[in-house]
Amino acid sequence: MSKNCAIVVAAGKGTRMNTDINKQFINLKGNPILYYTLKKFQDNTSIDNIVLVLSKDEIGYCVENVLKKYHLDKVTHIVEGGKTRQESVISGLNAVKDSEIVLIHDGARPFIEDRIIEDGIKYAKLYGASACGVKVKDTIKVIAEDGFSKDTLKREELFSVQTPQCFKYDLILNCHKKALKDNIEVTDDTSVVESYGHRVYLYEGSYNNIKITTPEDLPMGESILENIKTC
């Protein structure tokens, strides 16, 4: 039976949050943000194990205050993140063992749904690469250097990509290695495989699947969590 591994990337410092603590460890309704993220993969029966990518100086804290405290035993490997997200993902990929599909997910994106996880695995098996996201609601403009609007993009052609981004393991590992060798810098993992001619299937995510990045995101996160609990 093929195995599926979630790589949860939580090594970023989150400087936009303006706190002394990493954003993944900020409490949301009494529990760390990272707990909610890991718990979704822990409880999903399609996920066999989790590789967690952390900053070196936060590994001990996370083990004691998140993994042991909440009994998150699907986390089989903890690896040290790199200077960039790209380096952190490669570290996570190198720790994966015997998995056909990997799901790369932001540690600060705690409202992932089972349906999104299942669809990501399904489409990655079919097409090699998949990513969830949502249609853009606002009008998007291209801004010129002088501050004036240069162009208006067609909203119906735009898609705000989220995580997890899901791949056949060999495909994403080989593309990341090539990108590192070729000095190609990317902002997400779908861009890595696209750089080498591979198509990515985009499927429906959720507007609740937000990434908590700034202080303004915390009240929204609390509201989403409250709604989830009452459903």
Swiss-Prot record:
A GO BP annotation: isopentenyl diphosphate biosynthetic process, methylerythritol 4-phosphate pathway
**Molecular functions per Gene Ontology:** 2-C-methyl-D-erythritol 4-phosphate cytidylyltransferase activity
Q: Which Gene3D superfamilies match?
A: Spore Coat Polysaccharide Biosynthesis Protein SpsA, Chain A (3.90.550.10)
Q: Where is this site: Transition state stabilizer?
A: R16, K23
Keyword Nucleotidyltransferase applies: yes
Marked site positions, Positions MEP for the nucleophilic attack: R155, K211
Database matches in NCBIfam families: ispD
Read off the HAMAP family from this record: IspD (MF_00108)
Please state what the protein is called: 2-C-methyl-D-erythritol 4-phosphate cytidylyltransferase
Q: Which organism is it from?
A: Clostridium novyi (strain NT)
Gene name per UniProt: ispD
